[in-house]
Amino acid sequence: MGCYLMPHPPIIVHEVGRGEERKIQKTIDSLENISQEIKQKRPDTVIVITPHGYVFKDAVSITTLPSLEGDLSQFGAREVKFKFENDLDLAREIMEETKKRNIPIAEVSEELIKKYVLPKKLDHGTIVPLYFVTKHYPDFKLIHMSYGFLPFEKLYEFGVAIKDAINKSDRRVVFIASGDLSHKLTPNSPNGYTPKGEVFDKTLLQLLSEMKVEEVIRMDKDLIEEAAECGFRSVCVMLGVLDGYEVNAKVLSHEGPFGVGYGVAKFDVTGYKSTSLLERFSTIEEDPYVKLAKESLEYYVKYRRPMPVPEGLPEEMYRRKAGVFVTLHKKGELRGCIGTVVPQKKNVAEEIIRNAISAGFEDPRFPPVREEELPEIEYSVDVLMPTQPVKSKDELDPKRYGVIVRKGFRAGLLLPDIEGVDTVEEQLSIALRKAGIRPDEDYTIEKFEVERHEQRVF
């Protein structure tokens, strides 16, 4: 098996570029090099994951049309056209392995295309890499897939599912991760410019050349977003395909004269590893507070009743009484937060069980959590310390203390160390708004500390 990172600028195709493609000659040379190598491997099947196919927010996709065809007519090169037989047996095996792992996958069939009036043509993210491959080796079946906007760890696991399906088959397979790097690489970029574009490209390619897979999957999400790339998620899936293998990685070229980064790299399997990185990515530090919140919500989603308090918890969780807040995040965004300032149950364990359910089902800002969302939910549990009255705002620190503001029966609470809340003024403003108290009213302030338990996903 061979894996490759290949960009897909239509201008690199001579029939589109009409000579302009010579400005990215290094990329052309690298793609020709890869295509010659693929010819030597003589794959039965080529799998392409593309950012420009059937992309869904909450699922990966795989196309199950009997034949896969398309052209570059939208780029003025109708004569550049291809038709491939779909490797449906392997495609269905990939779907089965993906479903076993509870990864949402959309089967793009004739029925789905008709129902949603989707285009029935291969995208340029697939055609451009295959333009080079087919010049040297056209005799293969194709599998066409697209990533979804799932957590990077989940995309990696999708790659593992693909690997498992390949290993069950008798196919010789080449996997192509189609994708461009930053679309804001230079001041002449049509998508705008940010110096972070170059930082992203250099960082990703350096990590890939050293096969620092964990560091790739854990790259700064803000950097990735600001770079305006389209290939990072394809890379995450490809790295999953390589899970468990010894790999010799080599970056062949990188350039971006048109303001978009084009990186070309190859990944040769040289042996086997005794461990899988997937286990690290899916491992949660077993903080008993977080574990109980997770188990509580998952139990309620499945059985629609609160779980009993389990045995084997730390003794303090049976003995201790305190207010508890449970916070849920999904893909880095808040998904629910409900809690109690003073304890309502006989111990912290019961408090967590109840408030985890409330965070998932009773936060009026969000719809109830669905079963298919559970793998993407991250949990934190805040155990509240006793409150203290505040006489001066100088006593406050939004990183250390949460606040409660009160006026009569109205009250608003904000936990400490909330992302984006950096000043006392911001903290109080949000708490007052939650309480429905005007800033010019006479209100009291209390502060409190929390014992925070957070989920750590690697």
UniProtKB/Swiss-Prot annotation:
Signal peptide: none annotated. It holds the Pfam family LigB. PROSITE patterns: AMMECR1. GO terms for molecular function: ferrous iron binding; oxidoreductase activity, acting on single donors with incorporation of molecular oxygen, incorporation of two atoms of oxygen. Residues 1-277 are annotated as: Unknown. Residues 284-458 form the AMMECR1 domain. This is Protein TTE1956. It comes from Caldanaerobacter subterraneus subsp. tengcongensis (strain DSM 15242 / JCM 11007 / NBRC 100824 / MB4) (Thermoanaerobacter tengcongensis).
